[in-house]
């Protein structure tokens, strides 16, 4: 990827310069607005530290949730500013707005090494506008915060697949660089997209088949096996004629699954047993059942132990592994064993078979942390779920493509 990097910017010198950084702080919060997974914040620290230590006046942009272009306290970045201050060991101020009076005053008042976090960029409807003129106007207002001799660093890999103002349009207005996180993510994904060592095993979970069709099509030619679990497996099982009862089912995708099984049946590996639940509840009654024995009115919320064993055997011989999506409702302890078992099998293959393993962001990355698994047991945990999938599908990522211009 022929783009300028953070190292190039630091070599040019940042002392006294305003540097605007797009980070990805779209982190999960509980009802008390406490961050439940700091993974994305931790991943952003090296770039922010390097710029601060280089004497830059750092202005950070990010979004949280979907406030739909309106100021909404529920989506304020206040918890993020607090977490950044704790993790960096220095005060990170939060502007009261995005490009308003407070943001300008604070940006103008920065001294070398200071870090300012702008309020949620999605509080401004122009951030996600389909109208290029609106996005350009917003980008100009953001770029103005950098004054003369400013620079833009793209370090939010989880958003580079979106052509939005703070990711894409601003890069047209300032000298632009890939942050350390974006650079690492792209190099890892290039490795598995272009030259994966065989056997290459892809593990797909998550709720919707429709979200993963593109990646199955794209990877079927390269992968030796595609393991399918999670909510999406029930549409495949239904396509094979199994009665999945009240399990998550995309009826309109059954024909597509039938077609995929006809073409890639030798590669697609499905569960052989399930963990059925009486209702969608962490305290639901549960049973381990074979594929046609889900009690009437019940639903499956996880893959069963035989499936974990089968999938583990496939993974044990792999040299390259890409995992995106949990195997079940891991947030409920009673239905987390499938995800835990697969994650552990990937960790074991990484250590025992020297496999190159990538966790493709999103819920799979969250599950590793929620279940207390060893994050260092994987070769790489991506911060971008949708972005990593789109990259592997062969789609252009606007936020990366613009950096090459």
UniProtKB/Swiss-Prot annotation:
Annotated positions binding substrate: 24-26, 40, 63-66, 122, 162
Recorded GO MF terms: ADP binding; ATP binding; phosphoglycerate kinase activity
GO cellular component: cytosol
Residues the entry annotates as binding ATP: 212, 331, 361-364
Disulfide pattern: none
Pathway it works in: Carbohydrate degradation; glycolysis; pyruvate from D-glyceraldehyde 3-phosphate: step 2/5
Root EC class: transferase
Subcellular location per the Swiss-Prot or TrEMBL entry: Cytoplasm
Record's catalysed reaction(s): (2R)-3-phosphoglycerate + ATP = (2R)-3-phospho-glyceroyl phosphate + ADP
Keywords: ATP-binding, Cytoplasm, Glycolysis, Kinase, Nucleotide-binding, Transferase
Any Pfam family matching the protein: PGK
Keyword DNA-binding annotated: no
Recorded family membership: Belongs to the phosphoglycerate kinase family.
Matching HAMAP family: Phosphoglyc_kinase
Subunit-level organization: Monomer.
Full protein name: Phosphoglycerate kinase
